[in-house]
């Protein structure tokens, strides 16, 4: 009797436990949390990019703005400026010289890269909105490119004023980020901070399309050449593949959009009102034709590989840590 009772109680408990397990709804991802994760990961990637690539970017900007006629000339000028400093050693002053104007990208890097990677995630959702349920989750090359282009639209609102101040700092003797921003606003109003926005979007729209698509394609190809993990196990981040794919993405983008970046830099460094057409004509006539649109290409490409390798490594490792610690 007691044995039957205990058995029935045991089976009842098992049934209740089973029914509770079956009725428990699956844990859904929190959109707000996912957005925050995208912002944080993008910001980490951006900080990595700035510290890796800023010296190359400084040289590129000086070549594009006509302050140096070659990479060697730009480097020589920076070292000469360091020699004129009274305080500090030549080495420390040279390091400071190569990181001149680093504050604007550092201040703007978190929102720029956060918005960019968040925008890419939003873009992926938009381009796959009409996909059939149960179909493949993999994006086509066209969908990747479209999502990348979409990411550039909100990013331009942050990128344009930040790069405007950065270019002014790198090409003049304005003391600090705040001082340069104040001078720009004083001379031309708030709208002056957004000078070159159209050129920025013209660069970053197709540039981001190529950037994200080439990264995804390169990473997927490189990963496909590696032995697969056991089913059900999360694959660790392959640092080499991520860095190679990130470097390829950066170089592909800069090769494609470099002439537009030269026009943008010319517009943002100018103290007079110009449009893209007049800036293009001026560059063509004064800098020897087509080659005038490619000054500083060497340092830009030298910068793009390590900087973008660092960007995507920072993003991927941050997402990996989020997953590892259940964030």
UniProtKB/Swiss-Prot annotation:
One of its GO terms (biological process) is mitochondrial transport. GO terms for cellular component: mitochondrial envelope; mitochondrial inner membrane; mitochondrion. Its main location: mitochondrion. It is a multi-pass membrane protein. GO terms for molecular function: carnitine:O-acyl-L-carnitine antiporter activity; O-acyl-L-carnitine transmembrane transporter activity. Residues 1-29 are annotated as: Disordered. Residues 1-11 have a biased composition (Low complexity). It is found in: Mitochondrion inner membrane. The chain crosses the membrane at residues 33-49, 107-123, 141-162, 196-212, 244-260, 293-313. InterPro entries: Mitochondrial_Carrier, Mitochondrial_sb/sol_carrier, Mt_carrier_dom_sf. It holds the Pfam family Mito_carr. Solcar repeats lie at residues 33-126, 139-221, 237-321. Keywords: Membrane, Mitochondrion, Mitochondrion inner membrane, Repeat, Transmembrane, Transmembrane helix, Transport. Belongs to the mitochondrial carrier (TC 2.A.29) family. PANTHER family: CONGESTED-LIKE TRACHEA PROTEIN-RELATED, MITOCHONDRIAL BASIC AMINO ACIDS TRANSPORTER-RELATED. Transports carnitine, acetylcarnitine, propionylcarnitine and to a much lower extent medium- and long-chain acylcarnitines. This is Mitochondrial carnitine carrier. It comes from Saccharomyces cerevisiae (strain ATCC 204508 / S288c). The lineage of its organism: Eukaryota, Fungi, Dikarya, Ascomycota, Saccharomycotina.
